[in-house]
């Protein structure tokens, strides 16, 4: 993870993720999203820290056991960019993108493609996700 490389030590909990996000903002980016899928336990927590905001946005969810998680980071970043292009603000874009990725992992958890880590199911049900709610 970028946070691990920057600090040269593993990030082990949400408080360390919050601190790392604040440190990474010092490089001049407008927002930092640290994924917490590597944390121990059955809950995951992602941390979104936006420049100029004192409190981070936390996105928690239950961890889904699946061998098919290859590409989740790329899918998440692409989905965030898509929702930003649709006019959502960053926290909303991240929330919707995480929902899309979570559903893709859930829908693909029992599918076996070759050996090793397979991809999430990107095509689980795309139509409802492309409708912008007013």
What are these regions (language model features)?
Residues 1-6:
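Short, small-residue-biased leader/transition segments that mark boundaries at the very start
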Residues 13-18:
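Charged helix-capping and loop-helix junction motifs
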Residues 19-61:
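Conserved phosphate-donor
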Residues 36-40, 62-65, 97-102:
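Glycine-rich beta-alpha junction loops
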Residues 55-57, 83-97:
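Phosphate-handling active-site elements
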Residues 63-80:
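Short glycine/threonine-rich catalytic loop with a Thr-x-Gly-x-Asp
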Residues 75, 79, 83-87, 103, ...:
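Solvent-exposed, amphipathic alpha-helical segments
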Residues 92-134:
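Charged C-terminal helix
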């Amino acid at each position: 993870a970028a946070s691990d490389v920057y600090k040269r030590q593993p990030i082990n909990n949400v408080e360390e993720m919050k601190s790392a996000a604040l440190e990474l903002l010092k490089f001049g980016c407008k927002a930092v999203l640290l994924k917490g899928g590597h944390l121990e336990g059955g809950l995951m927590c992602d941390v979104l820290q936006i420049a100029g905001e004192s409190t981070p946005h936390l996105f928690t969810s239950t961890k889904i056991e699946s061998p098919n998680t290859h590409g989740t980071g790329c899918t998440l970043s692409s989905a965030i960019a898509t929702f930003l292009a649709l006019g959502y603000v960053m926290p909303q874009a991240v929330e919707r993108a995480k929902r899309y990725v979570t559903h893709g992992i859930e829908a693909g958890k029992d599918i076996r493609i070759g050996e090793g880590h397979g991809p999430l199911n990107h095509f689980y049900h795309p139509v409802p996700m492309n409708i912008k709610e007013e």
